[in-house]
């Protein structure tokens, strides 16, 4: 037994010595672990846990190979562009001549008329096709959608790397680096927008600045050694930097002046070369560090310059990161210059090489500016100066500027947060983590890297500026809260790292005041979350090589840590320190990880919708238009390849009023007039510069009033209204009528779906929009309608019972052959009690035998729709009175009852929301020819 223990002890000692001698292996394993953790968290969506093992639901939300569809809505826009790029060599649906030049053209978005696209493909499309080519070469069943699904998860593997190295640089603590990286990786807001399936651009809003900050801090750390600025042009680093800048300049300039199909090739070359230089720079830095050689600061500064030059292609607001770093460098230089003259405090503050810091700043700012000018032109290059001046207005989504309704006021992620707690929760998961992160930022001015207390102001300056800017943006719209995630995560990591550094001073105060409580904290967390440990370790096995690769890497790190602790058993203080810091790290990372395990999100696109959209694609003319509310527009254009009235990229337009009006009105002639106008001439009748807008001197209210008068009537009556009532000339009246009463209108298909019932307060508010009210009138002061959903039961003998939940009350209607009674029921102390009745103005009852329409009480403020299917299923809806005869209600609840020109042609399953089934409905709009009289 003794021999076995001795052998085990020797083996552990050898392992510990090995990791100490080859410390880079430990760092490599930590990086690998962080990459695997990030991927695993983001891959959970592929398991479709939302279905709860319901095979029907899994089949509905996946393709024929069982691979889940993309999440959200905007990813389908980029998916369509990616497929176009693969099939056509550009992102357009076709090529059109625009301003005398052949240009890729999007036929379907905001159509007619659609719009031109740049030749240069978005970076997300290139990333999608890169994964597709690799994966498809292995598995021929893989589609471009399948590849797009994994883009955010693959790129998300990079998120933790810069955080780990930044925190490690600040604190010299691997524990702190891991804690900070995990905090970022698991931040709920960021996780949702970068999980597998969310193939959108948020990943590109975060990644560039993370790496640029890391590169800048590494460059500052290497400030003592320079090559270029001491004119050592034969130095390999000097040659590499010069060559990289020249090549980037040439390729970037070529991309800027290229035209036509060569732009696609140039952009691929630009991204490839930029990535190659960044990877080469990191490899060079790694090799030099392994050899124990000092790095020249120009190397990491070059990487920061290259990535800054690429950033505008990833996100339109790229300049905020450049401004943060530039402000930091300027303030840091000023602070160092002031502190350098203070002889008494110089020994406590790390001043460093001020001259080289100035050189570094010039290199980064000027180098970035030159590349930006070459690649994009002067406009983009100076946008870090010009953009912030007008961005405050852009951030304020409630600003009304055109007289038309502002759709952004109804987009949840653009709403202003109600509290700091909401911002912090969206940014990093909880108020507690955010507060600790802020404390870490405050503590970052202390340098405890070498068990000595010194002041180092650079980290606190950078992080304070970064956090202040991002939190300010978050106060203008909750979607920007994710921008504050990186500085808060770094702050958390610094806090943990500083505690470890303080413990390593081995004072009794540190060990007993921090070490032992930290250990107890870790044990309590382990105990509290013990039931979820297995899920945290293995959240998914969808990609086995990653899942089990993570466990192997974690096991190797655990073996190292055990050997490290055992090697210190003879030194009780050292043992307490190592055990305490390990438990502290575990205690910090487990809560945020447990909060996102399991993690699942259901797609919107599904096979029920696919069936309906495929029907449109196969059975309608190519010039057909789909009229719908904007939210699902990208899905419709992707699957049906038909024009849509508006979508998630064009929602804030006058069409929001017109489409809302078409659904909310009870006037069928007005509704089809609106649809006919939008489907054929788009915005021609009401855009700025149109006949009516010029006639009314850009008075939107008057323009809308005129159009609402002429759209429901035939052409001759509309002509009389325009010429006799409003005094337009014959020529101008006919120009208006060409847009509103076209001779050759595009066919139109209306789509309704169950969620439209839920969001009726939104589209009806726009449909009932009162243009005479001040533009900044709050939404809650405007007229809107609503529907409340419930169930209905046929009890036999002509008796029907309907139950609709309205907030916390049940509105019950009992109908029999002789009487209709109502009751409002509330649960009080667990008992259902009738607390009153309600008055129904109009009642619609649809059965397999037909529709019965009854007016019950002229004073009723609610109306009710009841639908009983042949198989016994029953549905009920309460409606506000202003929507009781709306086109939407008659279409979705009654299948077009009472309408002459809009007919149901296809209905398929809608599994996305509770409601009528089949609930995805397609209607053909028949304009007829009478309107041309």
UniProtKB/Swiss-Prot annotation:
<keyword id="KW-0460">Magnesium</keyword>
<feature type="topological domain" description="Extracellular">
    <location>
        <begin position="258"/>
        <end position="263"/>
    </location>
</feature>
<feature type="binding site">
    <location>
        <position position="200"/>
    </location>
    <ligand>
        <name>Mn(2+)</name>
    </ligand>
</feature>
<feature type="site" description="Interacts with target acceptor peptide in protein substrate">
    <location>
        <position position="413"/>
    </location>
</feature>
<feature type="topological domain" description="Cytoplasmic">
    <location>
        <begin position="168"/>
        <end position="174"/>
    </location>
</feature>
<feature type="short sequence motif" description="DXD motif 2">
    <location>
        <begin position="200"/>
        <end position="202"/>
    </location>
</feature>
<dbReference type="GO" id="GO:0046872">
    <property type="term" value="F:metal ion binding"/>
</dbReference>
<feature type="topological domain" description="Extracellular">
    <location>
        <begin position="44"/>
        <end position="146"/>
    </location>
</feature>
<feature type="topological domain" description="Cytoplasmic">
    <location>
        <begin position="449"/>
        <end position="454"/>
    </location>
</feature>
<comment type="pathway">
    <text>Protein modification; protein glycosylation.</text>
</comment>
<dbReference type="GO" id="GO:0045232">
    <property type="term" value="P:S-layer organization"/>
</dbReference>
<feature type="transmembrane region" description="Helical">
    <location>
        <begin position="175"/>
        <end position="195"/>
    </location>
</feature>
<keyword id="KW-1003">Cell membrane</keyword>
<feature type="region of interest" description="Interacts with target acceptor peptide in protein substrate">
    <location>
        <begin position="629"/>
        <end position="631"/>
    </location>
</feature>
<feature type="short sequence motif" description="MI motif">
    <location>
        <begin position="756"/>
        <end position="763"/>
    </location>
</feature>
<dbReference type="InterPro" id="IPR003674">
    <property type="entry name" value="Oligo_trans_STT3"/>
</dbReference>
<feature type="topological domain" description="Extracellular">
    <location>
        <begin position="476"/>
        <end position="479"/>
    </location>
</feature>
<feature type="topological domain" description="Extracellular">
    <location>
        <position position="196"/>
    </location>
</feature>
<feature type="short sequence motif" description="WWDYG motif">
    <location>
        <begin position="629"/>
        <end position="633"/>
    </location>
</feature>
<keyword id="KW-0808">Transferase</keyword>
<protein>
    <recommendedName>
        <fullName>Dolichyl-phosphooligosaccharide-protein glycotransferase</fullName>
        <ecNumber>2.4.99.21</ecNumber>
    </recommendedName>
</protein>
<keyword id="KW-0464">Manganese</keyword>
<dbReference type="GO" id="GO:0005886">
    <property type="term" value="C:plasma membrane"/>
</dbReference>
<dbReference type="GO" id="GO:0004576">
    <property type="term" value="F:oligosaccharyl transferase activity"/>
</dbReference>
<feature type="short sequence motif" description="DXD motif 1">
    <location>
        <begin position="72"/>
        <end position="74"/>
    </location>
</feature>
<feature type="transmembrane region" description="Helical">
    <location>
        <begin position="428"/>
        <end position="448"/>
    </location>
</feature>
<feature type="transmembrane region" description="Helical">
    <location>
        <begin position="147"/>
        <end position="167"/>
    </location>
</feature>
<feature type="topological domain" description="Cytoplasmic">
    <location>
        <begin position="340"/>
        <end position="361"/>
    </location>
</feature>
<keyword id="KW-0812">Transmembrane</keyword>
<feature type="transmembrane region" description="Helical">
    <location>
        <begin position="362"/>
        <end position="382"/>
    </location>
</feature>
<keyword id="KW-0472">Membrane</keyword>
<dbReference type="InterPro" id="IPR048999">
    <property type="entry name" value="STT3-PglB_core"/>
</dbReference>
<feature type="transmembrane region" description="Helical">
    <location>
        <begin position="23"/>
        <end position="43"/>
    </location>
</feature>
<feature type="transmembrane region" description="Helical">
    <location>
        <begin position="455"/>
        <end position="475"/>
    </location>
</feature>
<feature type="binding site">
    <location>
        <position position="413"/>
    </location>
    <ligand>
        <name>Mn(2+)</name>
    </ligand>
</feature>
<comment type="pathway">
    <text>Cell surface structure biogenesis; S-layer biogenesis.</text>
</comment>
<dbReference type="Pfam" id="PF02516">
    <property type="entry name" value="STT3"/>
</dbReference>
<feature type="transmembrane region" description="Helical">
    <location>
        <begin position="582"/>
        <end position="602"/>
    </location>
</feature>
<comment type="similarity">
    <text>Belongs to the STT3 family.</text>
</comment>
<feature type="topological domain" description="Cytoplasmic">
    <location>
        <begin position="218"/>
        <end position="236"/>
    </location>
</feature>
<feature type="site" description="Interacts with target acceptor peptide in protein substrate">
    <location>
        <position position="74"/>
    </location>
</feature>
<feature type="transmembrane region" description="Helical">
    <location>
        <begin position="319"/>
        <end position="339"/>
    </location>
</feature>
């Amino acid at each position: 037994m003794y021999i076995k223990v001795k052998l085990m002890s020797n083996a552990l000692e050898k392992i510990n010595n090995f990791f100490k001698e080859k410390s880079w292996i430990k760092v490599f394993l930590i990086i690998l672990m962080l990459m695997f953790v990030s991927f695993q968290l983001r891959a959970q969506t592929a398991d479709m846990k939302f279905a709860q093992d319901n095979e029907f639901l899994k089949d509905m939300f996946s393709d024929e190979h069982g691979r889940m569809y993309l999440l959200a809505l905007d990813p389908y826009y980029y998916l369509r562009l990616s497929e176009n790029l693969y099939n056509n060599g550009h992102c357009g649906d076709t090529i059109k001549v625009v301003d005398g030049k052949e240009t890729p053209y999007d036929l379907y978005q905001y159509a007619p008329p659609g719009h031109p696209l740049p030749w240069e493909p978005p970076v997300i499309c290139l990333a999608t096709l890169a994964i597709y080519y690799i994966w498809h070469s292995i598995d021929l069943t893989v589609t471009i959608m399948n590849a797009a699904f994994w883009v955010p998860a693959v790129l998300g593997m990079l998120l933790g790397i810069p955080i780990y190295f930044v925190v490690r640089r600040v604190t010299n603590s691997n524990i702190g680096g891991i804690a900070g990286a995990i905090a970022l990786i698991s931040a709920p807001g960021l996780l949702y927008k970068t999980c597998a399936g969310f193939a959108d651009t948020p990943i590109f809003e975060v990644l560039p600045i993370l790496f640029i900050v890391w590169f800048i801090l590494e460059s500052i750390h290497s400030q003592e050694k320079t090559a270029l600025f001491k004119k050592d042009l034969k130095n390999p680093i000097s040659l590499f930097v010069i060559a990289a800048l020249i090549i980037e300049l040439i390729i970037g300039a070529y991309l800027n002046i290229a035209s036509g199909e060569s732009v696609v090739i140039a952009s691929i070359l630009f991204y490839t070369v930029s990535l190659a230089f960044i990877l080469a720079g990191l490899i060079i830095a790694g090799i030099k560090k392994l050899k124990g050689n000092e790095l020249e600061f120009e190397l990491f500064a070059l990487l920061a310059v290259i990535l800054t030059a690429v950033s505008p292609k990833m996100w339109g607001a790229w300049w905020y990161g450049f401004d943060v770093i530039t402000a930091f460098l300027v303030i840091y230089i000023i602070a160092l210059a002031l502190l350098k003259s203070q002889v008494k405090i110089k020994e406590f503050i790390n001043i460093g090489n001020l001259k080289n810091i100035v050189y570094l700043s010039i290199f980064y700012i000027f180098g970035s500016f030159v590349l930006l000018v070459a690649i994009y032109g002067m406009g983009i290059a100076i946008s870090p100066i010009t953009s912030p001046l007008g961005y405050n207005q852009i951030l304020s989504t409630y600003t009304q500027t055109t007289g038309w309704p502002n759709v952004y006021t109804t987009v949840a992620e653009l709403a202003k947060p109600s509290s700091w707690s909401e911002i912090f929760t969206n940014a990093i998961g909880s108020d507690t983590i955010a507060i600790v992160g802020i404390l870490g930022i405050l503590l970052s001015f202390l340098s405890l890297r070498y068990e000595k207390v010194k002041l180092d102001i650079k980290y606190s300056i950078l992080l304070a500026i970064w956090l202040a800017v991002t939190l300010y943006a978050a106060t203008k719209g909750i979607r920007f809260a994710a921008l504050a995630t990186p500085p808060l995560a770094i702050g958390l990591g610094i806090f943990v790292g500083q505690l470890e550094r303080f413990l390593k001073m081995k004072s009794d105060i540190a060990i007993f005041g921090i070490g032992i409580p930290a250990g107890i904290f870790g044990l309590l967390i382990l105990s509290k979350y013990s039931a979820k440990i297995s899920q945290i370790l293995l959240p998914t096995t969808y990609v086995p090589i990653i899942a089990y690769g993570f466990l192997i890497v974690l096991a190797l790190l655990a073996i190292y840590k055990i050997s490290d602790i055992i090697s210190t058993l003879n030194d009780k203080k050292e043992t307490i320190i190592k055990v305490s810091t390990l438990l502290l790290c575990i205690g910090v990372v487990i809560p945020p990880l447990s909060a996102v395990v399991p993690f699942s999100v259901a797609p919107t696109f599904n096979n029920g919708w696919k069936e309906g959209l495929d029907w449109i694609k196969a059975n309608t003319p190519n010039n057909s238009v789909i009229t719908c509310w904007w939210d699902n527009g990208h899905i419709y254009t992707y699957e049906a390849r038909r024009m849509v009235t508006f979508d998630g990229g064009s929602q804030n337009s006058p069409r929001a009023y017109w489409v809302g009006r078409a659904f909310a009105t009870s006037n069928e002639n007005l509704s089809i007039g609106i649809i006919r106008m939008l489907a054929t001439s788009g915005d021609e009748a009401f855009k700025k510069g149109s006949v009516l807008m010029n006639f009314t001197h850009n008075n939107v209210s008057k323009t809308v009033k005129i159009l609402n008068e002429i759209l429901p009537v035939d052409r001759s009556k509309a002509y009389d209204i325009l010429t006799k009532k409003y005094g337009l000339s014959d020529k101008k009246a006919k120009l208006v009528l060409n847009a509103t009463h076209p001779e050759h209108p595009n066919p139109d298909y209306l789509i309704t779906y169950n969620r439209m019932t839920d969001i009726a307060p939104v589209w009806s508010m726009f449909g009932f929009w009162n243009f005479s009210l001040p533009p900044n009138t709050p939404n809650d002061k405007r007229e809107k309608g609503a529907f409340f959903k419930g169930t209905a039961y046929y009890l036999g003998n002509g008796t029907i019972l309907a139950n609709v939940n309205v907030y916390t009350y049940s509105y019950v209607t009992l109908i029999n052959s002789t009487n209709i009674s109502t009751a409002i029921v509330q649960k009080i102390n667990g008992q259902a009690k009738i607390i009153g009745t309600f008055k129904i103005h109009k009642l619609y009852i649809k059965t397999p035998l037909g529709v019965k329409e009854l007016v019950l009480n002229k004073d009723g403020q609610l109306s009710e729709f009841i639908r009983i299917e042949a198989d016994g299923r029953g549905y009920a809806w309460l409606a506000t009175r202003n929507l009781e005869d709306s086109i939407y209600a008659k279409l979705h609840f009654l299948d077009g009852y009472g309408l002459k020109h809009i007919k149901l042609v296809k209905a398929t399953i809608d599994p996305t929301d509770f409601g009528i089934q089949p609930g995805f409905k397609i209607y053909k709009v028949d304009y007829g020819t009478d309107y041309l009289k």
